[in-house]
């Protein structure tokens, strides 16, 4: 489609939907009754009697109703499918042509971005969920949970661990009506409306906003973090503040931990390992706490230390060289290694 044709199509679609207040009111009234006279329309609407004839003739010119020139004139409803068929074709043609012109912008690579509109904030939630490769944590309102149920289920299907907090808990979908098992690997409800909405993919890419910001409050902002060192802050907040105080269980499979599995958050890793009795092995990538140099260690996990408060979360790995290496999370100070990713398996150190 040429630029001139594209512009004409867009203008035509715009004109097609340019209905005034009286036209909309008259059209819906005729549509609901099937056939009316001008007097009937005046009686059933707030359209002044002198304006009724001009209004219905405008609808007739657009092909939305049929005018039968009898005494009195009769205005007959037409099937919306037939009446809007031409507009549908124009619209589909326009969308196809616009799609061909569209260049998808690269994802913002800035460390921190502020976004204001509700639609943009919600779009970023979809982006974060889609980006998750192995770990996804979300704090969602009930409406956001239902909106992104299919996206969350797709993440679960591709092997992503999905922990979800729903707030306010009193409005969370009933487990008998909502398939938490399909959309999450664990879900809890949290009391009150003060809980922020959050999504963090693999401890790196994240979005943070207040509940007001996703209720179309134009004075609120969402914050996008696109670096692991910053996404970790949101992930840590989720683990230590939100998850630990979400007391209503919505879905807890209470099954044997599925391994191999990769973690971005050491707290979640250590918490899960509390339920494992047999030997497990780990591959850890991160950096040396003292020198800042990149570190990669592999070996058997011989000890874990964990407190529900989140203040302590450590694994000790016995390497093939006979070293005992203490591994902590982001900004670790007491351990030997600051872990960025931890892969855990039962039989041998997994690939990472």
Swiss-Prot record:
GO terms for molecular function: DNA binding. The keyword Transcription regulation applies. Disruption phenotype: Deletion causes severe growth defect in various conditions, such as nutrient starvation in defined media, metal depletion and excess, and oxidative stress. Signal peptide: none annotated. Residues 36-57 bind DNA. InterPro entries: ArsR-like_HTH, TrmB-like, Tscrpt_reg_TrmB_C, Tscrpt_reg_TrmB_N, WH-like_DNA-bd_sf, WH_DNA-bd_sf. This is HTH-type sugar sensing transcriptional regulator TrmB. It comes from Halobacterium salinarum (strain ATCC 700922 / JCM 11081 / NRC-1) (Halobacterium halobium). The lineage of its organism: Archaea, Methanobacteriati, Methanobacteriota, Stenosarchaea group, Halobacteria.
């Amino acid at each position: 489609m040429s630029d001139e044709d594209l512009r004409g199509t867009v203008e035509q679609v715009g004109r097609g939907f340019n209905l005034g207040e009286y036209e909309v009111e008259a059209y819906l009234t005729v549509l609901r009754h099937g056939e009316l006279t001008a007097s009937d329309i005046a009686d059933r609407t707030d359209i002044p009697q002198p304006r009724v004839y001009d209004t219905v003739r405008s609808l007739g010119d657009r092909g939305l109703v049929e005018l039968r020139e009898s005494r009195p004139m009769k205005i007959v409803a037409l099937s919306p499918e037939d009446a809007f068929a031409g507009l549908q074709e124009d619209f589909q043609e326009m969308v196809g042509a616009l799609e061909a012109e569209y260049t998808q912008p690269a994802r913002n690579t800035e460390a921190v971005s502020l976004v204001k509109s509700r639609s943009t904030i919600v779009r970023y939630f979809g982006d974060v969920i889609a980006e998750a490769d192995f770990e996804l944590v979300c704090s969602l309102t009930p409406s956001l949970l239902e909106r992104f149920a299919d996206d969350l289920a797709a993440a679960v299907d591709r092997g992503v661990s999905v922990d979800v907090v729903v707030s306010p808990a009193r409005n969370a979908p009933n487990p008998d009506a909502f398939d938490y098992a399909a959309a999450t690997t664990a879900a809890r409800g949290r009391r009150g409306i003060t809980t922020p909405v959050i999504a963090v993919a693999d401890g790196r890419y994240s979005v943070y906003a207040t509940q007001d910001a996703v209720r179309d409050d134009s004075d609120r902002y969402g914050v996008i973090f696109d670096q692991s060192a910053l996404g970790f802050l949101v992930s840590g907040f989720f683990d230590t503040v939100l998850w630990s105080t979400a007391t209503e269980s919505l879905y807890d499979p209470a099954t044997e931990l599925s391994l191999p599995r990769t973690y971005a958050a050491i707290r979640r890793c250590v918490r899960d390992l509390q339920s494992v009795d047999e030997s497990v092995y780990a591959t850890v990538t991160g950096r040396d706490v003292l020198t800042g140099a990149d570190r990669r260690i592999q070996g058997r996990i011989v000890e874990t230390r964990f407190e529900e408060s989140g203040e302590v979360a450590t694994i000790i790995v016995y390497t093939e060289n006979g070293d005992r290496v203490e591994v902590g999370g982001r900004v670790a100070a007491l351990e030997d290694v600051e872990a960025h990713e931890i892969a855990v398996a039962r039989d041998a150190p997994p690939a990472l």
